[in-house]
A protein has these predicted regions:
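Rossmann-like NAD(P)-binding element
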Residues: 49-69
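Adenosine-phosphate binding glycine-rich loop
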Residues: 87-137
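Rossmann-fold NAD(P) dinucleotide-binding segment
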Residues: 66-81
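Conserved S-adenosyl-L-methionine
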Residues: 16-24, 78, 101
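NAD(P)-binding Rossmann-fold cofactor-contacting core
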Residues: 19-40
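Residues in the short beta-alpha loop(s) of Rossmann-like NAD(P)-binding domains
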Residues: 7, 29-31, 87
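Glycine-rich adenosine-cofactor-binding loop
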Residues: 1-17
C-alpha cells in the first residue's frame, strides 16, 4: 500500500491500513512530513523517484490535492488508484481511460466522514477487495 502525502487524511489512512495489517509506504514532497512518517513506523520513498516505484504497489491512496501524477506516471501504476484528494486531484481521471476499474473515486469520503472514520472505512473496503474481490488471494 502506498499513501501519497502525509497530511491529516493521509496520516489517518496510513494508520487505518497499518492497523488492518497492511504493509504501508508513504511518499511526500515535503521532507519534514516524510521524516514524521518514518518516525511513526512507515516505510518512506522519495517522491522524486515515483516513476521507478509506482508499478510496485497494488493500491495507491492519493491525498495530495494537486496534479502530482502525469499521464506517464499513471501508465506506471499497475494496481488500484484511490483518489481521496479534493480538486484539482492527484491525477486526471482521463489518464485512466480504458482502465476505469483501476480508478476509485473516494473524494467525498474524507468530507462525508471524519478523517479517522473515513480512513477506517477505506481500509475496510480495501481489505474486502483484497480478500473477496481477488478470489481470496
Amino acid at each position: 500500500m502506498l499513501v501519497t502525502g502525509f497530511g491529516r487524511v493521509a496520516e489517518f489512512t496510513a494508520q487505518a491500513l497499518k492497523n488492518a495489517g497492511c504493509d504501508v509506504y508513504v511518499t511526500a514532497r515535503n521532507k519534514l512530513k516524510l521524516i514524521r512518517a518514518e518516525c511513526m513506523g512507515y516505510k518512506i520513498i522519495d517522491f522524486e523517484k515515483k516513476s521507478s516505484f509506482l508499478y510496485l504497489f497494488d493500491y495507491i491512496f492519493n491525498t495530495v490535492p494537486e496534479n502530482i501524477f502525469t499521464e506517464e506516471d499513471v501508465g506506471h501504476i499497475k494496481g488500484k488508484y484511490f483518489e481521496l484528494a479534493s480538486a484539482p486531484y492527484g491525477a486526471d481521471k482521463e489518464y485512466f481511460i480504458g482502465r476505469e476499474n483501476d480508478y476509485i473515486d473516494g473524494k467525498a469520503l474524507p468530507g462525508r466522514y471524519f478523517s479517522r472514520s473515513a480512513a477506517e472505512k477505506l481500509a475496510e473496503i480495501t481489505l474486502k477487495h483484497i480478500n473477496y474481490g481477488n478470489g481470496g488471494d
